């Protein structure tokens, strides 16, 4: 994991999206969503198989959501927030990043 990426998966729309170790630490931090710790595979599955909706306030952010039967506290879905970011490198080429920012449970 030299790049700091835990995994990279392709969503149903053809986007390669990654989860970094830093973002996963953020998700499972005791002040955020520590209940997500055993659900790393569900986070990946949500990005791969889930539906998504664009954030109302940030058109470069999306929420992916997918139902699971075994979630705690009557939750029905895993929600994964993903950011799309583009920049231009010094050589003029386009850099593209699509990465998980956070994840949590929700009742739909």
Residue ranges and their predicted role:
Residues 1-108:
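Ribonuclease/tRNase effector modules and their secretory precursors
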